[in-house]
Amino acid sequence: MLPAANRMRRSDEFARTFRRGTRRGTRRLVVHAATTDAGEPPRVGFVVSKAVGGAVVRNRVKRRLRAVLMHRVTDLLPGTLVVVRALPPSANATSAELERDVDGSLTSLGLRAKVVPAR
């Protein structure tokens, strides 16, 4: 599970990330990112709509995305807000595919403080 300090919960943080941030997308997800004060820890949020599937499918996608970001939150630059928005094809994606999509999007957005070698 993501540490409480790294979880995005307030709607104004989500709105700020969508409005002022940049985004990179793949077939399965879109990663939105914005920056805040450098003194704050990086925070991550997830959006998985009903278009992805029923409750069981949505929760499975959220669990997989949380697991991927849990290991990458320490690599993010301080003060970064990241929202991962799952698209309908993410329902049939494997964890490895979601991991590859998240890694590619974070790298292309330039959000990593240190580079992690590919597996």
Curated annotation (Swiss-Prot):
HAMAP family: RNase_P. This is Ribonuclease P protein component. It catalyses: Endonucleolytic cleavage of RNA, removing 5'-extranucleotides from tRNA precursor. RNaseP catalyzes the removal of the 5'-leader sequence from pre-tRNA to produce the mature 5'-terminus. It can also cleave other RNA substrates such as 4.5S RNA. The protein component plays an auxiliary but essential role in vivo by binding to the 5'-leader sequence and broadening the substrate specificity of the ribozyme. GO terms for molecular function: 3'-tRNA processing endoribonuclease activity; ribonuclease P activity; tRNA binding. PROSITE patterns: RIBONUCLEASE_P. NCBIfam families: rnpA (TIGR00188). Belongs to the RnpA family. Keywords: Endonuclease, Hydrolase, Nuclease, RNA-binding, tRNA processing. Its EC number is 3.1.26.5. One of its GO terms (cellular component) is ribonuclease P complex. Coiled coil: none annotated. Consists of a catalytic RNA component (M1 or rnpB) and a protein subunit.
